[in-house]
């Protein structure tokens, strides 16, 4: 706010009926009657998101809180639309993301966040080799937490990371649903996976942090202090490098 800058944003549509008019996801996915009737009228569709370039650079103190600020915005959206029970949209992976990492990530997501009711299906699903026994054998942990750590280690072996936004959703709610993956020819061929989050099922600490006014106030004070400390460290490091012969 002090800099009067837009950090980032989310395109969204607040749904009020069972007709998926103008929804981005409707171009690539078919919705079941159950989804149209019981979910869509109470849904906020989240479209393309962005973080402005000056907040994307690693090592820049500004970049630390960019994603957090976007979640603050989503929290405000939930508060302003009390009828909404679901967040629905697509998470994106680029074709430069290594396929073995992509497949391991999607296998994990479908294992722990399945769509057992076939609420949403892709019109042209991306061919994924998820039946390869390699992926099932990869996850030897006893629960979500252990297999999550295995996933992180495996992906890092290929010098990749779980995309930050996907990682945020994975740790937002235990009842998230993950649907099919498609290639989006209208946006450079990126690979997009549809997801659904039930707002009342969001972990209490996340809900408190991003949707309650008291939570916003505490979070803002905390982030201001963290930003002040990180900025001081950043300036100290810059000054030290500048004074070196």
Where are these regions (language model features)?
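Glycine-rich, charged/polar anion/phosphate-binding loops
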Residues: 180
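Residues that scaffold, gate, or flank divalent-cation-dependent active/transport sites
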Residues: 183
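Non-catalytic substrate-recognition and accessory regions of acyl/acetyltransferase enzymes
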Residues: 1-44, 173, 177, 187, ...
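Acyl-donor binding region in acyl/amide transferases
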Residues: 14-176
């Amino acid at each position: 706010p002090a800099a009067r800058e837009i950090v980032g944003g989310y395109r969204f549509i607040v749904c009020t009926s069972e007709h998926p008019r103008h929804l981005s996801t409707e171009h690539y996915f078919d919705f079941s009657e159950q989804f149209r009737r019981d979910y869509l009228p109470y849904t906020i569709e989240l479209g393309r998101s962005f973080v402005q370039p000056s907040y994307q650079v690693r090592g820049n103190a500004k970049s630390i809180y960019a994603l957090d600020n976007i979640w603050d915005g989503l929290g405000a959206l939930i508060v302003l639309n009390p009828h909404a029970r679901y967040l629905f949209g697509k998470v994106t992976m680029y074709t430069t993301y290594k396929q073995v990492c992509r497949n391991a990530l999607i296998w994990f997501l479908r294992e722990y966040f399945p769509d057992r009711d076939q609420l949403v299906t892709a019109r042209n699903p991306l061919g994924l080799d998820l039946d390869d026994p390699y992926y099932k054998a990869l996850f030897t942990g006893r629960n979500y937490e252990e297999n999550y750590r295995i996933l992180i280690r495996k992906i890092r072996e290929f010098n990749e990371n779980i995309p930050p936004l996907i990682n945020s959703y994975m740790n937002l709610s235990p009842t998230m649903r993950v649907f099919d993956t498609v290639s989006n020819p209208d946006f450079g061929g990126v690979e997009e996976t549809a997801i659904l989050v039930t707002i009342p099922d969001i972990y209490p600490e996340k809900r408190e942090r991003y949707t309650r006014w008291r939570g916003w106030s505490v979070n803002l004070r905390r982030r201001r202090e963290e930003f002040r400390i990180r900025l001081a460290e950043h300036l100290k490091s810059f000054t030290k490098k500048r004074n070196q012969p």
